């Protein structure tokens, strides 16, 4: 086996040196993950992923995975815990398209339940929960585990400036490929491990993606709702990056607090919006819709 592995590595190295080829490697097993000695203050995170029976907020979870990591003042991962994963019976048939996407069948989840006490303990004892698209995971996890409501969350998809770092897109699998890795996605435990590997990689500027994520996520921001903006302003607001909140029937955005004054000036001048609603946001409130 050792000789075969060495031969494969030599072949991969040879291909990797050729401009006409790109070599992708499978994610390493947990035992092979590189760990270094911590420097400075150490904090913890729970990396989380869920699979559900659909995209609606009230669609039940069928697959939950949590894996704890510890990271130091540099944003370097210095410890990786064992993954925990649970199936849960949604009480209804899993749609065929979800089974095609995830491979999870009715038989896999029949009679299964999430260990709520263990899941809550794993999350609540950390500094922050991390998910790749936390706006999807956070409200669904808090709905299933209400005692962790108000825990800090960070989003590795949207709170890391991937395009500015030279990456094309934000999808987990695509980001991995641009780092020379691949995984079989759409299972909670696999996606969690992929997220950990993505965040732990040192980027060309010498920092990890995790360092950038934590720095961005822990800073407060402000949610601006363009209340009473005229209907005619909708295209301008959309082009600016505002999103439509169907329930509140208003356009909204979330920006760094340092940009607040300039944004209010823009709303007044470009949209005749003089009474926007401002809500301070920390990582304990963010990603809840």
Across the structure, where does each feature detected by a protein language model lie?
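Acidic two-metal-ion nuclease catalytic site recognized across multiple nuclease folds
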Residues: 1-36, 201-289
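Conserved non-catalytic scaffold segment of RNase H-like nuclease domains
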Residues: 2-151, 158, 165-185
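Residue-level "edge-of-site" marker
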Residues: 112, 189, 250
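Short secondary-structure capping/turn micro-motifs that flank functional sites
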Residues: 115, 192-193, 253
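Short Asp/Glu-rich motifs
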Residues: 118, 195, 256
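Active-site catalytic microenvironments for nucleophilic, acid-base chemistry
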Residues: 144, 178, 198-205
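Acidic, divalent-metal-coordinating active-site segment for phosphoryl/phosphodiester hydrolysis
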Residues: 190-198
């Amino acid at each position: 086996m050792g000789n075969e592995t060495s031969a494969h590595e030599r072949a991969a190295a040879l291909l990797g040196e050729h401009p006409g080829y790109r070599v992708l490697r499978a994610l390493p097993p947990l035992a092979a993950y590189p760990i270094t000695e911590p420097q400075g203050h150490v904090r913890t995170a729970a990396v989380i992923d869920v699979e559900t029976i659909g995209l609606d907020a009230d669609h039940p979870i069928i697959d939950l995975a949590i894996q704890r990591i510890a990271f130091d003042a540099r944003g370097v991962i210095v410890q990786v815990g064992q993954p925990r994963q649970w199936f849960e019976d949604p009480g209804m048939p899993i749609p065929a398209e979800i089974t095609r996407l995830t491979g999870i069948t009715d038989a896999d989840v029949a009679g299964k339940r999430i260990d709520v006490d263990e899941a809550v303990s794993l999350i609540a004892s950390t500094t922050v929960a991390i998910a790749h698209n936390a706006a999807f995971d956070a409200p669904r996890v808090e709905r299933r585990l209400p005692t962790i409501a108000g825990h800090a969350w960070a989003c590795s998809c949207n709170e890391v400036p991937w395009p500015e770092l030279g990456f094309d897109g934000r999808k987990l699998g695509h980001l991995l490929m641009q780092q020379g890795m691949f995984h079989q996605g759409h299972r909670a435990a696999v996606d969690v491990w992929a997220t950990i590997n993505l965040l732990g990689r040192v980027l060309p500027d010498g920092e990890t993606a995790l360092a950038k994520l934590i720095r961005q996520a822990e800073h407060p921001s402000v949610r601006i709702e363009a209340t009473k903006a005229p209907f005619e302003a909708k295209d301008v607001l959309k082009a600016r990056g505002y999103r439509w909140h169907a329930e509140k029937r208003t356009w909204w955005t979330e920006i760094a607090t340092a940009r607040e004054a300039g944004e209010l000036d823009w709303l007044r001048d470009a949209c005749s919006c003089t009474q926007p609603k401002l809500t301070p946001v920390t990582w304990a409130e963010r990603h809840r819709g």
